[in-house]
Amino acid sequence: MTESFAGFVEDVRLIDHHVHGAYGADSNEERFQNSLNEGNCGLLAEPSAAYESQLGFALRRWCAEIIDLPRHVTAELYWRRRSELGELEISRRMTRAAGVSHWLIDTGFKTAGMLDPRGMAEIAGATVHEIVRLETLAETLIQSDQDPGGYVDAFTGLLASHAPIVVGAKSVLAYRAGFNHDLSRPPADRDVAESAKLWRQRIESGGAVRLDDPTLIGFGLHCAISLGLPLQLHVGFGDRELDLDRANPLLLLDFLRSVEASKVPVLLLHCYPFEREAGYLAQAFDNVYLDVGLAVNHLGVRSRSLIARSFELAPFTKILYSSDAIGPAELHYLGARLWRNAITAVFGRWIDDDEWSEADARRVVELVARDNARRVYGLP
């Protein structure tokens, strides 16, 4: 591998096709520590344990220099310096160091102190596009004065009003109901209306607003398809509210075989530990794409193996870059940093072994870093 190839990977601008806002407001160390754990959706019993992880080690190795500290600084000194700079300055430094030209932001999950898309564009000095989360849109609608009996037309109209200002739609079906449902056809209007009525009754009786009805979620998916929106589906690893065995993308086979699903790009997000299954689906279906974003940060140095596996079966025109970062902007930076490290190491080895030419490697880097996302989402 030549130094010029390593420099090429370092300089390539990325399109992060699935990400969330960074924090813009200061808070305490416990918020920061809890943000470094994906699996536990509650508050950590020992927040400092978050530092004793692949992500914690990667953060102290790669992010320390961005805030003027030596590599591998202690967690105590890292937090002290971070507090001196403040959250907004951290977000500015980290997002700009990531080398991302376009952030495609899922605005459907928000926490206190998080930057909105306009704030992200300003702080990162980059272009921002919005991804609409279908379940959040439905939850907004069901809490309105809209008669649930008219849910079909109301949701269709609401999503259609968003279509001109977003570049895609995202579903968290994996979290809410799992993939083990028949999604191959749009549900009947009467079934949708009945499910909406039951949902409203549950809320009025003091139940949760959280949408977990597979009929309504499936209806949302097919609405997005009918509008021609690229469809993002969270796959695999997430917090403990998700049943991992029901988040295997192979359970989507009947859906992907359907005529309806073939009409739009279907993007399998993150996929760990099902990246090989996702790679098979990307090879098997013309309209299926994947990334391995979320797990990259959490695997730290071991993400090199994950990223290498993503290049086994999937055509290189079907792999995209994402970080799925949310909250601390270190995650927005680390996603890019660890991806560049892995690509340089993995592709570099293939070049050195004369399995790949450097010209081919450069071309694939550009495909995954940005060109595939440009094509799928119709970005300028």
Predicted regions and their residues:
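Divalent metal-binding pocket/active-site signature
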Residues: 164-276
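Acidic (Asp/Glu)-rich catalytic clusters
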Residues: 93-97, 115-130, 157-166, 223-226, ...
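Divalent metal-coordination and catalytic microenvironments
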Residues: 18, 103, 169, 234, ...
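Mid-to-C-terminal alpha-helical segments outside catalytic/metal-binding sites
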Residues: 1-17, 29, 33-69, 73-81, ...
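H/E-rich (His + Asp/Glu) clusters that bind or coordinate divalent metals
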Residues: 254-256, 262-380
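Histidine-centered catalytic micro-motifs
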Residues: 13-26, 230-236
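Alpha-helical scaffold segments that flank or form the walls of functional sites
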Residues: 30-124, 130, 152-164
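Active-site beta-loop-alpha junctions enriched in small/polar residues
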Residues: 20, 108, 133-139, 172-176, ...
